[in-house]
Each structure stands twice: as structure tokens, then as C-alpha cells.
């Protein structure tokens, strides 16, 4: 059986969340703008996520920058990484990948 009960999303006082749809169980300590975040996504301090769709369990490490990215389930974006796609051609990261 699937578990559909997650803790509420945590938005750090230093975190930013604008014009985004955020599911339960997320931890947002960085900046999230114009995004869709599925359950259990973590955005660490200093990370910037803009115009992205991040599926369940994705982790964006400290000081990473994502723009126009679609990340499948359980993706890890390493500390300080930059991934920038275009609105017409987003960067797509496969399930369980570490970038």
C-alpha cells in the first residue's frame, strides 16, 4: 500500500517560495520560484530553483542552481552544481541520477 501521509512542508525563515506548487513533506531552505515540487523534495541553503519540476525525493544540495530542469524521482543535484535549460528545451535528469 502506498503511504499518502507526509509531514507538512517546512519553509526555512531564510527560504524563499514564490508562485510554486509544493507537495507535503518538502524541506525548503533555499529559493524556489515558478516550480512544481512533489513530495519529499529538499532544497538546501543557498540553492536556487527556478521554472523547474522536481519529482518525489529529489535533493538539491547547497548552492546549486537549477533553471528549466525536470528531475525524475530520487535525483540528487550535487553541491554547487549549475543546470540551466531553456523553456523550449528543459534539462531532463533521469530517475535515481546524481548530477
Language-model features and meaning:
Residues 1-99:
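Left-handed beta-helix
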